[in-house]
Structures are given as C-alpha cells and as structure tokens.
C-alpha cells in the first residue's frame, strides 16, 4: 500500500530514493527548497543574445525564484547550459511561442505584470509592492519590451541610474531587481514559500536528476512493494 501526500506524492518512494543521496545532498535540497518561491517569477521576451537568457535563469536560481518564462516568438534558441552553470536543472523553464500566450498564462495564475522599462511613468525599485505576486518582464537588448507587454502591464519599473549610461544589460537588471524584491519579501509576513506538496514534488524531481540510475531504483522499489 502506498502512502500519498494530497493524492500526489508517494512519501515512501521519496524516502527510498533519497536514501541513495548523501545526507549532505538530501539536506541541501530541503534547505534550498525552503527558500524557493513562486510569489515572484520572471519572463524574458525574445532576447537575442543567448547568454543573457541563460544568465537570467542563473539569477533566478541564486535568488530563489523557481519559475522562469521564456518567450521565443522571434528568437527561438536553446538555453546556454554553460552560462546557466547547471541552473536550468533546478529552475522550471516555461516556454511560449508568443508574448500574448505568456501574458495570459501568468494573469490566469494571478500575477501582476511588471514591465521593466525606462519610461517616465515607471516606478522606482524601492516602491515595488512585494505583497502582490508579480511577474517581472525583461525585453530585447536594443528594442526593449514589446508594445503588447507595455499595454498589458499592471505597472512599469526602472532601476534609478546617475551615470552617463542610461541602461543596463538585462541579466544585470534582472539580478538587481530579484535581489531587491526577494530580500524585501523575506522580511514580510507574506506566505511566499512553496507549498508542502510543491516541496515534496521538487524533492523527488531533484533526487532523480542527481541519481543516474533512478529508473532502476524506482522499478526495484515497486517490485519489492508488490512482494510484500
């Protein structure tokens, strides 16, 4: 008989698979998942330079953002694994063939659309309301975000600058914004962490990614269970 969490996760299977991890690795997975959030997410729209998208994914991993949304309406490319430094294994990458599809999907999930842009009507970073779930959109290197994103944005955001340079690389902008909003979020009473079920699902998924022979281990687990 299997023991499930909310009808989804076989707890005994999870514990069995994790027994093949080192205690340090199993503990690290749990520790990192305690810092993960879906309260904020990031969307990159048709970024031309592949390393920029990869660097944004890496920043999401560093600052605990679990989901990234990649729009490839014009520029269809694979994720640069070298630049992401393995982050693509631990961050969920959601791909879209159009900007409209991405915006609709995020709005349906209750996210505020925040467009990063130097427009005059944009707010500064310190004024972001971190209590609301938000999807931060980053655009193409030269053109920035499309009119569709700007028209559908609930708010617009810019990073204050005082030098001759008027813009930052999108991966740098993403890192600055994510560091600020996630740090500010953790100081609040907002329930920003993953649910218990989401953590269990990720523990199982991450364990499989670490253990090369996980398919054989799972098959053996069910064979042993049937013999009982």
Model-found features: residue ranges?
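Post-transcriptional modification and biogenesis factors for structured RNAs
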Residues: 1-228
């Amino acid at each position: 008989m299997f023991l499930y969490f909310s009808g989804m996760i076989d707890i005994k299977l999870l514990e069995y698979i994790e027994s093949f991890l080192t205690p340090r690795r199993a503990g690290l997975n749990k520790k990192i998942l305690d810092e993960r959030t879906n309260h904020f997410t990031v969307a990159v729209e048709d970024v031309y330079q592949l390393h920029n998208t990869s660097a944004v994914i890496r920043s999401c991993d560093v600052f605990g953002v679990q989901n990234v949304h990649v729009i490839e309406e014009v520029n269809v490319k694979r994720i640069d694994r070298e630049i992401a430094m393995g982050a693509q294994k631990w961050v969920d990458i959601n791909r879209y063939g159009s900007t409209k599809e991405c915006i609709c999907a995020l709005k349906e999930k209750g996210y505020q659309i925040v467009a990063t842009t130097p427009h005059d009507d944009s707010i500064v970073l310190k004024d972001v309301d971190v209590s609301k779930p938000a999807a931060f959109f980053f655009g193409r290197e030269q053109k920035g975000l499309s009119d569709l994103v700007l028209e559908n944005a609930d708010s617009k955001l810019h990073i204050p600058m005082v030098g001759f340079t008027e813009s930052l690389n999108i991966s740098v902008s993403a890192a600055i914004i994510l560091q600020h909003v996630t740090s500010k979020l953790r100081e609040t009473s907002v329930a920003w962490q993953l649910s218990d079920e989401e953590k269990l699902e990720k523990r199982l998924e991450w364990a499989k990614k670490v253990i090369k022979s996980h398919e054989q281990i799972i098959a053996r687990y069910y064979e042993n269970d049937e013999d009982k």
